[in-house]
């Protein structure tokens, strides 16, 4: 990494320019801290001796005379993207010319590459005495005159060339002014850019001093500004145009009382004495940084970007295509479905109702409103994608620029390359999906480039980065560190705010930070003056962002937004950690040098701190309590931060209490130890860094390292010191050796250990290691299950895994695998197969409804439990209900639970399981849900289990245990309603079918008798058993028994089951005045339906009538079958809708034809000009732009100029060909030269090849034709297209041609016709998918 001050050997030249006389008056050369002999040789100027010239040549190089000359050098340096660029008019002048001989002054103030133009203004002030507000700075770059701000008139850039001052013929107060500025003053806007661009490689700038105009005319100006109109002419026609740092009041003060400027406007005219003092201190500190930079880089460069010393914790990548791409973000939003992986999308666009934000989210989304309240500047779509619990955010703007951002844990130690690679892998599938949308997303063609494409620019910004200085300081040393930053604060390099925390030093680094959004100040001010709050900012702020220099309110907001990058330095036991927030990659490299030069100076050189302020290795060895624990977590957080993987895990400080935690050393630290000390260390592993780590146990009472198994969620072994050494052949010796070799201790290791050691059965209440057993609690084993088993059998609960990557509370999953004697992954694969069923939605009492299909549910099961690549979001417990149902389906196994609530046990069983238990055929498992985990219950013999883990987990009808469970289940359902068997007992009637809803509950029975139609008999929602009675998931049938047959059955039912008597309370009547059913009272309260009748049944005559405005069945049908074949009336409406919009479809084809005709012609003109131009000669460049202006507008010229400046000649023509220009949209003008009849004939000739004629229209689904594109390119299923041509009835085509011709010849219709580019019929009509929720907000 190069860190040099180029301005030391190629100094900045500042030439003063007098616009009144159009002459250059003096040049100041900023030499900086050069050797004394160089300074002396420079100042001799024309009296330099050969020795002086030799000194200058040795220092500045062979071209020293050019570097110290008065040439106006054009085309040097880097491009300043943020600055207003103006074409050099053909004035007969070349920019590389020698000026008349003028006075040259030499300044010892240093210029640095990290100086912004705001800094340059201050250094010009101390060198020349011209305060910042009087300076109009301009310079040349790439043959272009540039200034340090942007002046906009009605949104368009205003040409700013102070050399044209004398060309203005209108005067006020003796000064030339541009009167047109005053007449449009409300449309003027000044954007201050001084703080957002570095001087970089600009080595010659010019300054026009306002005083050269004002001082000679002060009396005349004073008189003129007494008149408001003349004042406005002066201010807007001259001052705001060239010296916008001045507010109207400040300009008036400058004219009337110039000596009061420093007092009234200290930011515009700072104290010269204070400024000189600060700049000299800044120069001293920055020169020191440059002097030490290369040495420090060489010392630390090997580790600077390595995983151990760098961690990117958040970042944003910006992808900027080199060509303009028009992307319809509204359509992308509409066509892109929300899924569990991409659970939320937000779009901002301009709809028919104004600025609109639409958000949609999958029902599994945990933050459905995220980003919906964001402030947008341009049409934008935001997508959030989850990969392995990590959220990635993609933001795409309508010009094709897009941004990718995410966050990472510091422990992941991502460097810049891995961040780019990770984000690229995330973005590629989404970009491919969007590109496949074709013209629906890209109405003018093109596609979004991938990050690997050569036609893009990539930048990394908004980064938060942690880096580590590999030395430690004592508390006194860290205090010394803080005090040394005070000089940097006095120099203005940093800013310290607020109270400081112990062990942390927090400040804002200001110097050289420039990558801000200049528009952010506007947004903040708009927020502060929104509805309901009084606006306390001067209205000039909205016109001029230099207001921070003359308005204290704006200054405070400016400092908040642009005050620097937040830096935090942490005092740690093992190193010094530095966090940098919201920085770019360029800023990281720059800040890293400043920070590490500062830190290295603490331990090297004449200013190094005292030895007793450095934290020694001995201090680490004698660390106590919290410091030891902190050192372990700092050096290996993956091992010691257990709750990173399981929020319920016991923390390390409890597992290994003081003074038992060991001391950890890195390999570098071990190398510096004496050989005798190294022999005492135990070699283990650093799980965070993936390298060896070494441990010692310094406390005399606990001198032996041991490794704890079964505590870490990922089965890592945890180091902890013990009193005694593990003896050979013991269990502890085996565990320690396994951990030191494999670094983990898992179930298989435990099984291996079982064959070597015997174990006792644990008491209930403790956490049960994998494959260990524990006794059942006394009240369950000895009371509830009394006499159900015989010795030597025992009841026990068996230890299983409790955690899994991507999901917490995984004990149930592992319990089911143990019960079924299956490998966990094999179980997941089998139940995933069972999940992929049309009735997936009934799983988990309707929890399956969260998914759009059984395939989606099956996929998520595999991703989570087999591949472990996903998370279950907020359904982290709902999955358990789904799994229990799937196990019941696959293995006919039902589970009951004993839940331990602090010693009080609750018996829990689902209604469907109760039904199974009460049926003749049953097979159950018993599971204990405790605070320590979820475990299966078993019957085993202790010795048998120790030998081969044999146990009984499943209980059937013949087991005594089943009798206990069955009696408990009967007790739980004793208050339930009649069961289906009761209905079976009514003579002459049988249950023909059970109707099941989407929550998998039975809601009605269809009773068969000797009639043709079944009786509809509702019941309270209840679980059902799988028996010989068919089940039906469809809607309530329409063909049902009459009231007479229904009432006959109810009468028999009431007679046999008086406790459940059905008593009607109201008659149900539909909107056709038909009687369709009744509502029952009492315990039932259910809707009984029968075949519609016009006659009120006699048995119901005295009851009130309840009108059903909408039949609930119709609502269910709309929900369950929204895409079924429409009613005939709907089909007629769709046909009419289609015919009414055929004209818009025809316009799409019409414009597509014109794009191909006209834009190709214009492009050929541009290509011919490009090939004939020598871009190395200014006269040839001027001729190129002059000719270009004959057939393209100013905005297109700006676009072409930007392409030529940012692209090498080899690729420039290719980029031009791909780009979209304004001339691509100016299509109708050539056609207006035709007569009406001629135009009709021409249009027929153009469009007939695009039309597929037909006689009549078939069924049309309206939902498919909201988004429409040319049939030539459409990638969507569009019913208006056939064979890539538009389908139009023969009798309509002639009419449309006449309408189109009339519209083209009508100038008032131009904008209406061009609106078809929107690509939608109704921009607020969106595709409705299952599992998606859409909300719309207007933004005003």
Swiss-Prot record:
Keyword entries, A-Z: Transcription, Transcription regulation, Virion
Signal peptide range in chain numbering: none
Subcellular location: Virion
GO cellular component: virion component
Family, per entry: Belongs to the asfivirus G1340L family.
Function: Putative initation factor.
Protein name: Early transcription factor large subunit homolog
Source organism (scientific name): African swine fever virus (isolate Warthog/Namibia/Wart80/1980) (ASFV)
């Amino acid at each position: 990494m190069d860190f040099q001050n180029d301005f030391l050997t190629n100094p900045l030249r500042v030439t003063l320019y007098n616009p009144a006389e159009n002459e250059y008056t003096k040049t100041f050369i900023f030499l900086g801290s050069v050797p004394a002999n160089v300074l002396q040789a420079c100042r001799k100027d024309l009296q330099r001796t050969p020795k002086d010239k030799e000194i200058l040549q040795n220092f500045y190089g062979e071209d020293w005379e050019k570097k110290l000359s008065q040439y106006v050098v054009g085309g040097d340096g880097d491009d300043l993207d943020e600055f207003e660029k103006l074409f050099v008019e053909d004035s007969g002048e070349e920019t590389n010319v020698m000026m008349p001989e003028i006075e040259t002054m030499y300044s010892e103030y240093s210029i640095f590459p990290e100086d912004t133009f705001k800094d340059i203004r201050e250094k010009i002030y101390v060198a020349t005495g011209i305060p910042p507000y009087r300076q109009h700075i301009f310079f040349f770059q790439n043959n272009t005159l540039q200034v340090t701000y942007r002046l906009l008139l009605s949104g368009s850039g205003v040409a700013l060339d102070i050399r044209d001052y004398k060309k203005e013929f209108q005067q006020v107060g003796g000064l030339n002014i541009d009167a047109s500025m005053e007449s449009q003053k409300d449309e003027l806007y000044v954007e201050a850019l001084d703080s957002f661009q570095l001087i970089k490689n600009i080595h010659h700038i010019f300054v026009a001093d306002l005083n050269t105009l004002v001082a000679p005319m002060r009396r005349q100006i004073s008189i003129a500004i007494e008149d408001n109109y003349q004042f406005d002419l002066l201010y807007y026609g001259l001052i705001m145009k060239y010296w916008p740092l001045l507010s109207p009041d400040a300009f008036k003060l400058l004219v009337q009382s110039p000596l009061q400027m420093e007092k009234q406007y200290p930011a515009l005219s700072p104290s010269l004495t204070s400024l000189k003092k600060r700049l000299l201190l800044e120069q001293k500190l920055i020169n020191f940084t440059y002097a030490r930079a290369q040495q420090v880089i060489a010392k630390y460069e090997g580790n600077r970007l390595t995983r151990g010393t760098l961690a990117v914790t958040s970042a944003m990548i910006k992808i900027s295509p080199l060509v303009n791409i028009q992307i319809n973000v509204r359509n992308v939003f509409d066509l892109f479905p929300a899924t569990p992986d991409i659970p939320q999308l937000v779009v901002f666009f301009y709809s028919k109702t104004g600025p609109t934000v639409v958000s949609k989210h999958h029902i599994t989304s945990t933050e459905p409103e995220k980003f919906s309240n964001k402030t947008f500047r341009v049409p934008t779509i935001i997508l959030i994608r989850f990969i392995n619990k990590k959220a990635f955010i993609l933001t795409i703007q309508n010009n094709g620029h897009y941004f990718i951002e995410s966050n990472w844990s510091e422990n992941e130690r991502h460097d810049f390359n891995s961040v780019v690679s990770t984000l690229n892998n995330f973005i590629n599938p989404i970009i491919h999906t969007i590109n496949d949308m074709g013209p629906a997303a890209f109405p003018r063609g093109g596609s979004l480039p991938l990050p690997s494409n050569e036609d893009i620019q990539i930048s990394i910004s908004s980064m938060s980065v942690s880096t580590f200085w590999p030395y430690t300081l004592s508390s006194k040393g860290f205090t010394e560190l803080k005090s040394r930053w005070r000089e940097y604060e006095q120099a203005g390099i940093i800013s310290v705010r607020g109270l400081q925390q112990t062990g942390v030093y927090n400040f804002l680094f200001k110097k050289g930070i420039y990558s801000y959004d200049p528009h952010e100040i506007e947004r903040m001010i708009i927020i502060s003056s929104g509805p309901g709050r009084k606006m306390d900012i001067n209205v000039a702020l909205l016109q001029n962002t230099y207001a921070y220099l003359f308005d204290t309110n704006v200054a405070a907001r400016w400092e908040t937004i642009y005050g620097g990058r937040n830096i935090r330095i942490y005092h740690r036991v093992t190193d010094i950690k530095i966090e940098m927030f919201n920085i770019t990659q360029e800023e990281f490299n720059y800040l890293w040098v400043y920070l590490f030069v500062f830190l290295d100076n603490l331990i090297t050189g004449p200013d190094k701190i005292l030895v007793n302020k450095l934290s020694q290795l001995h201090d680490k060895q004698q660390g106590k309590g919290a410091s030891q624990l902190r050192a372990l977590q700092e050096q290996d957080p993956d091992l010691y931060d257990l709750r990173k993987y399981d929020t319920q895990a016991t923390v390390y400080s409890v597992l290994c209490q003081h003074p038992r935690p060991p001391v950890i050393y890195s390999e570098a630290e071990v190398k510096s130890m004496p050989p005798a000390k190294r022999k005492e260390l135990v070699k283990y592993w650093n799980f965070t860094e993936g390298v060896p780590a070494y441990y010692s146990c310094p406390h005399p009472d606990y001198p032996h390292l041991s490794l704890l198994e079964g505590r870490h969620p990922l089965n890592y072994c945890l180091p902890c010191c013990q009193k005694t050494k593990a003896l050979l052949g013991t269990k502890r010796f085996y565990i320690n050796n396994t951990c030191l070799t494999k670094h983990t201790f898992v179930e298989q290791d435990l099984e291996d250990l079982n064959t070597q050691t015997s174990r006792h059965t644990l008491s209930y209440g403790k956490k049960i290691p994998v494959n260990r057993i524990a006794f059942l609690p006394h009240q369950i084993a000895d009371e509830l299950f009394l006499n159900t088993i015989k010795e030597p059998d025992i009841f026990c609960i068996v230890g299983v895994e409790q955690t899994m990557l991507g999901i917490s509370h995984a004990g149930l999953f592992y319990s089911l695998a143990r019960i079924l004697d299956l490998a966990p992954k094999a179980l997941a694969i089998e139940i995933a197969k069972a999940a992929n069923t049309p009735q997936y939605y009934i799983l988990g009492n309707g929890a399956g409804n969260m998914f759009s299909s059984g395939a989606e549910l099956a996929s998520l099961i595999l991703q989570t439990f087999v591949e472990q690549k996903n998370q279950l979001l907020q359904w982290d417990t709902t999955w358990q209900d789904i799994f229990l149902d799937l196990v019941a389906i696959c293995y006919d196994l039902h589970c009951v639970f004993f839940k331990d609530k602090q010693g009080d046990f609750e018996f829990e069983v689902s209604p469907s399981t109760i039904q199974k238990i009460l049926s003749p055929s049953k097979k159950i498992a018993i599971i204990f849900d405790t605070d320590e985990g979820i475990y299966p219950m078993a019957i085993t013999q202790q010795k048998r289990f120790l030998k081969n883990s044999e146990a009984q987990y499943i209980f059937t009808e013949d087991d005594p245990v089943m009798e206990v469970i069955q009696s408990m289940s009967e007790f739980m359902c004793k208050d339930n309603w009649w069961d289906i068997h009761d209905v079976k007992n009514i003579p002459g009637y049988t249950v023909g079918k059970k109707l099941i809803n989407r929550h998998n509950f039975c809601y009605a029975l269809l009773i068969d008798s000797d009639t043709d139609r079944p009786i509809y008999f509702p019941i309270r929602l209840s679980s059902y058993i799988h028996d010989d009675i068919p089940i039906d998931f469809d809607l309530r049938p329409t063909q049902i028994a009459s009231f007479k047959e229904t009432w006959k059955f109810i009468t028999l039912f009431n007679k046999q089951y008086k406790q459940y008597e059905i008593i009607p309370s109201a008659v149900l009547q539909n909107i056709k005045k038909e009687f369709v059913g009744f509502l029952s009272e009492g315990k039932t309260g259910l809707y009984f339906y029968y075949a519609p009748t016009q006659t009120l049944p006699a048995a119901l005559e005295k009851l009130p009538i309840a009108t059903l405005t909408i039949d609930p069945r119709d609502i269910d049908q709309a929900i369950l079958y929204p895409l079924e074949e429409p009613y005939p009336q709907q089909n007629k409406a769709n046909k009419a809708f289609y015919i009414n919009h055929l004209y818009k479809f025809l316009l799409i084809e019409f414009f597509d034809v014109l794009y191909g005709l006209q834009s190709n012609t214009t492009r050929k003109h541009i290509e011919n000009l490009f090939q004939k131009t020598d871009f190395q000669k200014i006269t040839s460049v001027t001729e190129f732009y002059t000719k270009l202006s004959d057939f393209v507008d100013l905005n297109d010229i700006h676009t072409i100029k930007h392409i030529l400046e940012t692209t090498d000649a080899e690729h420039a023509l290719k980029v031009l060909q791909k780009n979209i220009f304004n001339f691509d949209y100016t299509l109708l003008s050539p056609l207006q030269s035709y007569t009406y009849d001629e135009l009709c004939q021409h249009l027929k000739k153009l469009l007939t090849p695009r039309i597929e004629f037909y006689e009549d229209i078939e069924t049309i689904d309206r939902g498919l034709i909201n988004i429409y594109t040319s049939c030539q390119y459409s990638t969507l299923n569009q019913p208006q297209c056939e064979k890539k041509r538009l389908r139009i009835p023969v009798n309509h085509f002639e009419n449309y041609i006449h309408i189109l011709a009339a519209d083209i010849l009508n100038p008032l219709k131009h904008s209406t016709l061009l609106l078809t580019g929107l690509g939608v019929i109704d921009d607020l009509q969106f595709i409705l998918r299952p599992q998606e929720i859409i909300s719309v907000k207007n933004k005003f």
